[in-house]
């Protein structure tokens, strides 16, 4: 068995005295993730006077989050397996005296077996119960639950479908197009839209094999594919004392390959009546699954204003920042407080949506080349600032973008008093943002912020497909960007 090689633990001089109200707060949390989300969790812990322990692979040894945590430990083997080895992570938590583990998103965040392993070791898993993770992790069972409590669902097959004959029968009844979904899928993976019997036959086996490889479960199911919907999700917070609230919605319609690129809060198209109905539906589902901690209930909203439940993500979302910006509620802090057994100190009527927020995902990708992931070394880095601008990231000059992980480098979130102000602020922030050495989504995002349909709120999940002109942006650096890059190179050369 691999021995743990420790990155010399460094304890800060700050106090780790827990808050005085309620039962005792955690003294040390192991952050079972990396990059920007690890930094986000570490910051929340510091505000709660909780010590942190990070884990990292050799590929991440120079990561900012490794240096900012109070302690850090290398895990392996390889750059990814260590983050997925639940036994090793729980053993490490026990060895170093951590009393809780925060999984972030991705990796083990939706792994019920890992949550159970934490419980068995006396370690608090900062997230929902294993039972809730299991139920919401199976998209077929989640649909059945939603239907049983009266929440609308997209017409689909009743259970996992593997045999093509049953799939063809459903498609004939529902009408094309239909979408093939992995029963255990998520994050935009395991989805295939088909528009004919021939395409359905061709894709059933392929989708099943992909699902087996990605999720360890080859079962798939079919739904009627809704053309040009909005992808709307509601942020849930639920404590262990029966209180469940929602923090409003996010519009995540601007996507590539069913994966989100830009998130907006609140939605520009929801009426107060529809927001109330969808929020109540989200809470109904959370209550039915006996949910606690932070979670997201996702819906499709069709062009006629009908909404349909599609899934619940039992974890923290990448895009939680836009909700925090318009509600002034710290979601990660509340995750920790809830996991410690404390009641929420927020009532539904306390939640108000102030202004508008936009998040752009700054990915190391080439949008002109089908969003191909890019690697390399960051040769110049200057992040934007100013009122209403927030950066969540773990990138810096000389940072090497590894090929092993998600392409996300940073999240740029802005808030404005109005939609127009938020867009203007995002445009200005993207113009200020300098990140050289690897291709990123920054110039692509600049183009979107100037698109008239985007400015007018005329977008849905087909936005990128129906706006090919967005991909014709100029990749040449602006003169001021070159000045920054040259200055950074001179400073590095002279040892400044």
Where are these regions (language model features)?
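Short, flexible, solvent-exposed loop/turn segments with mixed acidic/basic and small polar residues
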Residues: 13, 182, 400-404
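Cationic, low-complexity basic patches in intrinsically disordered or flexible, solvent-exposed regions
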Residues: 14, 21
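A composition/secondary-structure signal for short, hydrophobic, low-basic-content segments
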Residues: 16-17, 134
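N-terminal beta-alpha lobe that positions the nucleotide/phosphoryl donor
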Residues: 22-297, 301-313, 317
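Catalytic cores of soluble metabolic enzymes centered on carboxylation/carboxyl-transfer
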Residues: 282, 321-323, 327-496
């Amino acid at each position: 068995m691999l021995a743990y090689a420790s990155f010399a633990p460094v304890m800060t001089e700050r106090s780790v005295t827990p808050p005085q109200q309620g039962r005792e707060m955690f003294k040390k949390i192991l952050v079972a993730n990396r990059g920007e989300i690890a930094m986000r969790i570490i910051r929340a812990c510091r505000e709660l006077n909780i010590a942190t322990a990070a884990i990292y692979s050799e590929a991440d040894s120079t990561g900012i989050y490794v240096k900012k945590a109070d302690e850090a430990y290398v895990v392996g083997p390889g750059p990814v397996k260590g983050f997925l080895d639940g036994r090793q992570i729980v053993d490490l938590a026990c060895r170093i005296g951590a009393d809780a583990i925060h999984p972030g998103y991705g990796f083990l965040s939706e792994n019920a077996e890992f949550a159970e392993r934490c419980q068995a070791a006396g370690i608090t898993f900062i997230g929902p119960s294993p039972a809730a993770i299991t139920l919401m992790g199976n998209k077929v069972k989640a649909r059945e639950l939603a239907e049983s409590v009266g929440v609308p669902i997209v017409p689909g097959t009743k259970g996992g479908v593997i045999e093509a004959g049953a799939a063809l029968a459903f498609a004939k009844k529902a009408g094309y197009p239909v979408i093939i979904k992995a029963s255990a899928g998520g994050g935009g993976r395991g989805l295939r839209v088909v528009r004919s019997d021939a395409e359905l036959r061709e894709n059933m086996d392929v989708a099943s094999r992909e699902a087996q490889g990605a999720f360890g479960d080859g079962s798939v199911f079919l739904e009627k594919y809704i053309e040009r919907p909005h992808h709307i999700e509601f942020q849930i917070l639920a404590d262990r004392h029966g209180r469940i609230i929602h923090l409003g919605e996010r519009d995540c319609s601007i996507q590539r390959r069913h994966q989100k690129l830009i998130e907006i809060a609140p939605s520009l198209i929801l009426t107060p009546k529809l927001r109330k109905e969808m929020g109540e539906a989200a809470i109904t589902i959370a209550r039915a699954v006996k949910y606690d901690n932070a979670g997201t209930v996702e819906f499709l909203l069709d062009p006629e204003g009908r909404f349909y439940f599609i899934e619940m993500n039992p974890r923290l979302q990448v895009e939680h920042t836009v909700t925090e910006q318009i509600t002034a509620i710290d979601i990660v802090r509340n995750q920790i407080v809830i996991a410690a057994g404390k009641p929420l100190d927020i009532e539904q009527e306390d939640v108000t949506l102030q202004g508008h927020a936009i998040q752009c995902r700054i990915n190391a990708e080439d949008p002109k080349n089908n969003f191909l992931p890019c690697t390399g070394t960051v040769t110049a880095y200057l992040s934007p600032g100013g009122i209403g601008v927030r950066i969540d990231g773990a990138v810096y000059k000389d940072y090497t973008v590894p090929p092993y992980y998600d392409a996300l480098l940073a999240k740029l979130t802005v808030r404005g008093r109005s939609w127009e102000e938020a867009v203007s602020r995002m445009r200005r922030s993207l113009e200020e943002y300098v990140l050289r050495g690897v291709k990123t989504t920054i110039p692509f995002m600049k183009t979107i912020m100037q698109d008239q349909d985007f400015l007018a709120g005329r977008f849905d999940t087909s936005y990128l497909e129906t706006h090919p002109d967005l991909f014709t942006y100029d990749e040449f650096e602006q003169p001021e960007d070159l000045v920054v890059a040259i200055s950074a190179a001179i400073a590095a050369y002279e040892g400044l």
